[in-house]
């Protein structure tokens, strides 16, 4: 599964990351915070949460609004060992 990381600039394209890369980063540090772009489907992000919960991690997921526009949001995912 490929997910798009949050954009660093409004005009830039989001970078992608795979589930395997996320898992590797979490294994190295024990816990990690990821910010995902709004272009990701909610279903894919729920699959990510479920995947790590099944592996025994605590996962916190929320939508973060950063502006007044309806489309000004990103997804925040905390994965804790």
Q: Can you annotate each of these PLM segments?
A:
Residues 1-42:
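An N-terminal amphipathic alpha-helical segment
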Residues 25-27, 50, 68-70:
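Sterically constrained small-residue positions within well-ordered secondary structures
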Residues 43-44, 60:
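Amphipathic alpha-helical interaction segments
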Residues 45-54:
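Short, aromatic/basic amphipathic alpha-helical patches
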Residues 57:
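Short phosphate-binding/catalytic loops that engage adenosine nucleotides
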Residues 60-81:
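C-terminal edge-of-domain segments
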């Amino acid at each position: 599964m490929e997910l798009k990381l949050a954009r660093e600039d409004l005009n830039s394209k989001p970078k992608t990351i795979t589930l395997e890369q996320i898992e590797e980063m979490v294994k190295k540090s024990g816990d990690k915070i990821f910010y995902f772009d709004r272009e990701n489907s909610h279903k894919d992000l729920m699959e990510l949460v479920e995947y790590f919960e099944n592996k025994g991690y605590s996962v916190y997921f929320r939508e973060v609004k950063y502006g007044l526009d309806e489309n000004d949001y990103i997804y925040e995912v905390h994965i804790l060992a």
